[in-house]
């Protein structure tokens, strides 16, 4: 019997492979290689264990999940187990043949990323040519098959002025929902923070754009909005609270409380091949470490919002304050709060450096060979 309520959702990061190279990607810097990915049997077992626990939703993500040839089989297995299935995709891989297979397998929803409404801007962010036209065609194919569509628009200093256009694009493409989400600075996003950080004025303009669209569109389009943490005064309840509502499975089969949890040194993350999902969720050391409120520092213990924001993001506390067990520096009570606000304002006011694109590191031998070739 479970000792804690089961997670609502499981996120299956099937692969880190992706045609795009977005500099804000939240995948880890050390990307999993193809040879490290969990096999079909492992993912099927994961879905079975999740359903047995009482999980309701399976989100297929990556990288680009449509690069996995077994994706239709996994979606069909999720459907047979009674799990709601959602595909999170770039829309530039697999195309209509794969989409036909996914529809036949019982896929229930598609989330499609959009980098910009300007074709050149979209390609610049994605590191991929003709990305917007391919996404447009994919969105049309999704809607032609009657599948619900959500657009995920990631906002930063280079596209903030075009939020109204992104909302209009969602209507044009037949989406039922759009998530207008400012970049969250984890993984590659943290590495590229200075290149992506918007100004306070840009943030204010995006808020006005979203509020205006909500009033004018009403029920025509659902609009979610996520602010950049660095300008906030209160932390968000990251993942609905550590190890409370969501569980993340990495391409290697590691069971994680969130996608960035591996950045926290000292936590031991276990693999599905070594221990059951239920046992890890209920009794795993890493899951218990920051679950609930007992771990919180004194200033959090007395906060009336402690069971609303659950202390904020542990990975961000480590990255910005040097301690995963301290206050999320987004919180105005944190000694580090003023510093991260100043950092955001300084970076936003400075010229944007070049992007460091999300690409896997080449093996040392290959890199050395390439370096020799470059000198010949």
From Swiss-Prot:
It comes from the Bacteria. Its EC number is 1.21.98.4. It is an enzyme of class 1 (oxidoreductase). It catalyses: [PQQ precursor protein] + S-adenosyl-L-methionine = E-Y cross-linked-[PQQ precursor protein] + 5'-deoxyadenosine + L-methionine + H(+). InterPro entries: 4Fe4S-binding_SPASM_dom, Aldolase_TIM, PQQ_synth_PqqE_bac, PqqE-like, Radical_SAM_PqqE_MftC-like, rSAM. Keywords: 4Fe-4S, Iron, Iron-sulfur, Metal-binding, Oxidoreductase, PQQ biosynthesis, S-adenosyl-L-methionine. Interacts with PqqD. The interaction is necessary for activity of PqqE. Belongs to the radical SAM superfamily. PqqE family. NCBIfam families: PQQ_syn_pqqE, rSAM_more_4Fe4S. This is PqqA peptide cyclase. It comes from Xanthomonas campestris pv. campestris (strain B100).
């Amino acid at each position: 019997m479970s000792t804690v309520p089961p997670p609502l959702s499981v996120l299956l990061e099937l692969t880190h492979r992706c045609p795009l190279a977005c500099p804000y990607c939240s995948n880890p810097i050390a990307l999993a290689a193809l040879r490290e990915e969990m096999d079909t049997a492992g993912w099927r077992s994961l879905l079975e264990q999740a359903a047995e626990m009482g999980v309701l939703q399976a989100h297929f993500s990556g990288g680009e999940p449509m690069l996995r040839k077994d994706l239709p089989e996994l979606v069909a297995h999720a459907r047979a187990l009674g799990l709601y299935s959602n595909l999170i995709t770039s829309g530039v891989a697999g195309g209509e043949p794969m989409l036909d297979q996914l529809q036949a397998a019982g896929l229930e929803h598609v989330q499609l990323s959009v980098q910009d409404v300007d074709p050149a801007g979209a390609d610049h962010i994605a590191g991929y040519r003709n990305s917007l036209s391919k996404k447009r065609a994919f969105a049309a194919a999704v809607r032609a098959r009657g599948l619900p569509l959500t657009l995920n628009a990631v906002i930063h200093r280079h596209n903030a002025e075009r939020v109204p256009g992104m909302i209009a694009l969602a209507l044009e493409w037949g989406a039922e929902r759009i998530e207008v989400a400012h970049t969250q600075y984890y993984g590659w996003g943290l590495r590229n923070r200075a290149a992506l950080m918007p100004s306070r004025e840009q943030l204010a303009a995006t808020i006005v754009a979203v509020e205006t669209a909500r009033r004018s569109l009403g029920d025509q389009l659902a609009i979610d909005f996520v602010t950049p943490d660095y300008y906030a005064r209160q932390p968000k309840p990251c993942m609905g609270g550590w190890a409370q509502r969501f569980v993340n499975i990495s391409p290697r089969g590691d069971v994680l409380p969130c996608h960035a949890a591996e950045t926290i040194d000292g936590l031991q993350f276990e693999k599905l091949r070594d221990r059951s999902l239920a046992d890890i969720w209920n009794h795993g050391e890493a899951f218990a470490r920051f679950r609930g409120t007992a771990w919180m520092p004194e200033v959090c213990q007395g906060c009336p919002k402690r069971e609303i924001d659950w202390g904020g993001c542990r990975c961000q506390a480590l990255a910005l304050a040097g301690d995963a067990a301290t206050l999320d520096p987004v919180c105005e009570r944190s000694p580090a709060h003023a510093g991260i606000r100043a950092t955001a304002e300084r970076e936003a006011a400075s010229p944007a450096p070049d992007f460091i694109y999300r690409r896997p590191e080449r093996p040392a031998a290959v890199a050395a060979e390439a370096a020799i070739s470059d000198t010949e």
